Every structure is written in structure tokens, then in C-alpha cells.
Amino acid sequence: MMAGDGADQSRRFFVAVHVGAGYHAAANEKALRSVMRRACLAASTILRQDSGECIDAVSAAIQVLEDDPSTNAGRGSNLTEDGHVECDASLMDGDSGMFGGVGAVPGVRNAIKIAALLVKEQITGSTLLGRIPPMLLVGEGARRWGKSKSVLIPGTVTEADQWLVTERARNQWRRFKAMLSEVGAKSILSAEEHPRGTENNETCEENVSSCAAADEDKIMDTVGVICVDNEGHIACGSSSGGIAMKISGRVGLAATYGSGCWASSKGPFGAPFLVGCCVSGAGEYLMRGFAARECCTSLALSQAGPASAAMKVLRSVMHQESSKIGTADKTAGILVVQADASVVVPGSKPELNAVEIAAAYSSLSFGVGYYGNSIEKPKISILRTRRQMSEAGVDHFEARIDLRPTCC
């Protein structure tokens, strides 16, 4: 991919991406590595521009992830119990603190486009008659708003689904639909035979969980991107098709403020502190824990480093949920970037010096990639735990990347 007009090869930047926590089958690894590489390059093309903005870079990278059928976002997303695609997405700008999210939006190829525009309109305050710009839109209303702003391809939900719904997703939906029907029939029979008992209902729930776990490729919820530009501006975003067989209208982690992504240029007490975080997992318990915001806050307060903060938050939300009723998957992944930017000449703009990147995950695998101006090509990895499937724990990866020129 070649840089466009106005590209400045001396501009410093950094981009980190992930394609979800869960289990990534070896057969899909090549496709996932390819899409992460292309997402990194799409963001870098914008960040090398003199006028390139982090919001646009995050949006461009996530659009690449949404358009690829190997991810659970946009095309190839998990289907609702009704057999349709409903997407969640959000984007946050670290400088302004503005957040834009869309939830359960049907018939949209790139939900991140709507989220990005929501952020921009809040920053500019461009509304008629002084109305407050929306921060979160859901369902058909989000789709209509996107069409009114000309950020969506014209067409009906049915027409969009023809592109969004892949054969793999449809086959998975049919398989899960049959499983649910079978379990439902057994539950009715069990209730008739044991009207006051719960043992058989619990067995049915366990059967569903074990059948789902046996699926070859099980990727939980979101994809995400974090971008930092030459001046130390930071932004991040998330996008997701949601969990398989979700109830229509369910709004998940990727659309929720403070949960799916978080970016900030200041610490809790107002001092400069550049940090961005994206979270992936079975969303409800991560939403209750405000996982992305908590990770950034913990990092700013402890100064122990991104890896320590990510592992601490992941262990905390897992522990809080461990005593609650239910057999839902509690695995997750957290990707966090802390950036260092300083003013070299008094009165001038800050300049990006280095970043620290960390990934913490309790899942069997977590697909991550990153790229910066001092790196020859994107570094891509499907991180895999050495733990057995039944073992609980948190693994991590961390690296520090110096983005300053190596010679004068």
C-alpha cells in the first residue's frame, strides 16, 4: 500500500489492532494475520499525512477489519437468533474525550463510520437550533441517521444482509438453532417430569455450553484499534457483530461507553497521560466492570505499566463474576497502549517519542498486531496460552517501541 498525497515519511505514529479474544483455529490464522496487517497499513497511510487525524485512522483500520469475513465484525458477523446481522461499534477521541457509539444497527456494512461521525459532530457541535449532538444511537434509528449523513451505502437491510451474511455464519446459525431447539424440547420434558427440580435444566445448560465450546473457531465479540499520531493525539475504537445467537436488539461491549474502548490524554488529576485501551470478550460482565476505562485509570494511578494494569483489571472483573450464577464464558482480552510525547522546543507541539503496548488475555488465544514509523513492517501475532481449556488464568504480552529516529 502506497502513501497518498501529502505523506510525510518522517512523521511518527503508532497503531495497534486486535481481532478478538477466544479461540482462533489454526486454519484461520493466515486470514487473520493478513487482515491485521492490512488494518495497520490502512491506519498508517492516514497517520503519515500532514492532515491525518487519529479518528480517521482508527475508522479506516476498523473498516478493513469489518470488510473481511474472517472477523466477527461487519461482513461475516455472528447472526442474531432471527438470522440477521446487527452490529455494534464505538470510537473515542482521547483529546476531547468525545465518544460515539452505535448499537444493534441492522443492514450496515461499516458501523464504525457512524460512530466516527458521531464523535466529529460532538467535537464541532454542528447541530441545528442548538440541539445536543447524540453520543449513542441504536437500531434502525442509527441506520437512518447514518444514511441521512451520507456515510452509508444506499439500500435496504435485506440487500445489505446479502453481503454481510457469509455462508460460514449461516451454517453456524443453523447448527446453533438446531441445538437450541433440541435443548428446548428436553427442557420442556424435564419440567414435566421434575416440576420442582433444577438438575435437568442445569444439564441442558451445560450441554449448550459444551457444544458451543466444541466449535472449531470461537472468537468472542469485538475487534479493536488504537492509534497515536505524531503530536501524541490518541484515539481508539471497537466493532463487533456480537455473540452468536444473541437476542435481536442486544447492545454489546463494542458500543458501550467505558467498556469496549477508552482513550485519554490526561490522568485522573489532569496531568498529561496518553493511554488507549480496547477490550474483547463475552460482553456483559466486562460492561458491568467498565473494563476499558478501569484499565486506563488503573494504569494512570499505579504507574506500574500497561501489562500490570491490564492483568489487574482482567483478574478483577473475572473475580467479581466468579461467584455469580451462570455458566457463560468469562474469557476476555485487553489491548492497551501508553504513549510518551514531549515538547522539545518551548512553544512547539509535542512530538511522539515511544509507546508501550500490552495485551492480557484469559482466553485460549488473542490476535494482535502493531506498527509504527520505526518498524519496517507490521508485527502480527496470534497469542496462544499454554493453559488447558479448563484452566483459568491470565497470560500477557508486552513491548516498548522507540519511535524516534535512530540517526541524525
Curated annotation (Swiss-Prot):
Q: Which family does it belong to?
A: Belongs to the Ntn-hydrolase family.
Q: Which UniProt keywords apply?
A: Autocatalytic cleavage, Hydrolase, Protease, Threonine protease, Zymogen
* Catalytic EC class: hydrolase
State the name under which the record lists this protein.
Putative threonine aspartase
EC number, UniProt record:
3.4.25.-
After translation, the protein is modified as follows:
Cleaved into an alpha and beta chain by autocatalysis; this activates the enzyme. The N-terminal residue of the beta subunit is responsible for the nucleophile hydrolase activity.
Organism, by scientific name, is: Arabidopsis thaliana (Mouse-ear cress)
- Superkingdom per UniProt: Eukaryota
Subunit structure comment from the entry: Heterotetramer of two alpha and two beta chains arranged as a dimer of alpha/beta heterodimers.
At what residues does the UniProt record annotate the site feature described as Cleavage? D221, T222
GO MF annotation list: threonine-type endopeptidase activity
Highest classification ranks of the organism: Eukaryota, Viridiplantae, Streptophyta, Embryophyta, Tracheophyta
In its keyword annotation, does this UniProt entry include Protease? Answer: yes
The entry's active site is: T222
**Gene Ontology biological process:** proteolysis
Binding residues for substrate, per the UniProt record?
R250, V251, G252, L253
